Amino acid sequence: MFRRNELNKDFNHVIKLFYKERKKCIKIMEMITEASIEYVKKQVDCGIDCFQLFETYCGIIPEQLYTEFVLPYSRKILNAAMNKNCKTIFFPKNYNLGLKHLNKDICDIASVDWQIPIETARTLLNSDIGIQGNMDPRLFFSDKNEIEKYLMSLSEFGKKNTNWIFNLGHGFIPGIDVKNVNFVVDWIKNHN
């Protein structure tokens, strides 16, 4: 949102803004947050059951900087849904050890990517928060035996963690084998 059509996804210009022009950055964050809150309220008024906030580039910001200067704005957006009795899912991609900063006041469920083992994410998260994730979508390029081996390990995790939702650690990748997607969906349905 800071710079459209940016080909470089390390966002150095945004991080530089955080360090050099903190007041300007805070003003921009406040504007984005207020617009997002209005959007969330309208979504809830239109009947959504759950709101998910994606922080796809969370991991490019140092954890301390994200926790101190971005997470409070994410919390405000998520709280707008929570204040209207709407469940929330928060996906701070690649936040990893920062997951320890999440609590029930921020979200109902934390979605995690494949960069952190699901068991580690669970130990970092407050036990009141559900967890969603974290299959690496690139696994769809593998064969069914390899996929099933991974699903078996997740199944064991699911038996011990009833507040877990199976999901990818991020979206689908172009070119994946749809037969493998169907295999995963069927496997999850049959092993629930």
Residue ranges: model-predicted function:
Residues 1-192:
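Active-site loop segments of alpha/beta catalytic cores
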